[in-house]
From Swiss-Prot:
Coiled coil feature spans: none
Organism of derivation: Escherichia coli (strain K12)
Enzyme Commission identifier(s): 7.2.2.18
Induction, as annotated: Induced 1.6-fold by hydroxyurea.
Function recorded in the entry: Part of the ABC transporter complex FecBCDE involved in citrate-dependent Fe(3+) uptake. Binds ATP. Probably responsible for energy coupling to the transport system.
Gene3D superfamilies linked: P-loop containing nucleotide triphosphate hydrolases
SUPFAM superfamilies in the cross-refs: P-loop containing nucleoside triphosphate hydrolases
Protein name: Fe(3+) dicitrate transport ATP-binding protein FecE
Binding site for ATP: 35-42
UniProt gene name: fecE
Subunit composition and interactions: The complex is composed of two ATP-binding proteins (FecE), two transmembrane proteins (FecC and FecD) and a solute-binding protein (FecB).
Cellular-component GO terms for this entry: ATP-binding cassette (ABC) transporter complex, substrate-binding subunit-containing; membrane; plasma membrane
Reactions accelerated catalytically: iron(III) dicitrate(out) + ATP + H2O = iron(III) dicitrate(in) + ADP + phosphate + H(+)
Membrane topology per record: Peripheral membrane protein
Amino acid sequence: MTLRTENLTVSYGTDKVLNDVSLSLPTGKITALIGPNGCGKSTLLNCFSRLLMPQSGTVFLGDNPINMLSSRQLARRLSLLPQHHLTPEGITVQELVSYGRNPWLSLWGRLSAEDNARVNVAMNQTRINHLAVRRLTELSGGQRQRAFLAMVLAQNTPVVLLDEPTTYLDINHQVDLMRLMGELRTQGKTVVAVLHDLNQASRYCDQLVVMANGHVMAQGTPEEVMTPGLLRTVFSVEAEIHPEPVSGRPMCLMR
C-alpha cells in the first residue's frame, strides 16, 4: 500500500515546518526518515497518520486521500508508534497490547480467538510475554517502549509508522527491533521509521529520506544517499564513508 504526499505544507505559527513536500515511499520496504532535530521528520510522520492536518497539500494511502477515510478504515490500514506515550494507570501489559485490536473488534467489543492470537504473537515478537500481567507503571522505560510497540504490531496493519522507536532501548533490544522491521518487510508490510543513528538506518533500511529545514534533501538507497557532501550539507559534519564490515552497507565515520 503506497504512502505518498503531494505539496504538503505545515506551519506552527509563522514557522513552516514542512514546505511543499512531495514524495512517494516504496511499498513493502523499510524507509528511514533522517535529518537534524527540528527538520520536520516527526511532523511528516504525524501527517501520515492524520494526527496533524496540513495547511495545504494531501497525504495519500493507496489511491485514497487519508482525510477521506474513516478513523476505523485508517486504523485498519496504518498504525503508529508515537515518540511520546501517555501511560494509562492500572492496566497490564497484555491489556495494553490488546488495545491494538480495537479497529478489528466486532460490535460486541470482545476479543476473538484470532485477536488473542495476534496479541500473543506481538508480545512474543517483542519479547515481553513474561511481562503480560505486570502493570505498565511497574516497567522500565525500555520495557514500556516494547509494550507499546507490541500494541502497534497487534494492530496488524499493512503500513507501520515508528517515531524514534529505539528510544529507551538497550543496544540488544535496538538490534532486535531492527531485525523485527526486517520481519515485517518479509510479510509485505511498509515500514517508515524516524531514526537518529545514521549507521543503523543505513544498515537496516532499504530507503533513506533525508530532511532539512522542512524540505526533502535526498531520497534513495543508502548507497545513493550516504555521501560526504550530503552529510556536510545536512548535518554540518565532515565524514568518511566506508563499507560496514558485516552488511557491506555505507557506514559514516566522523573525522
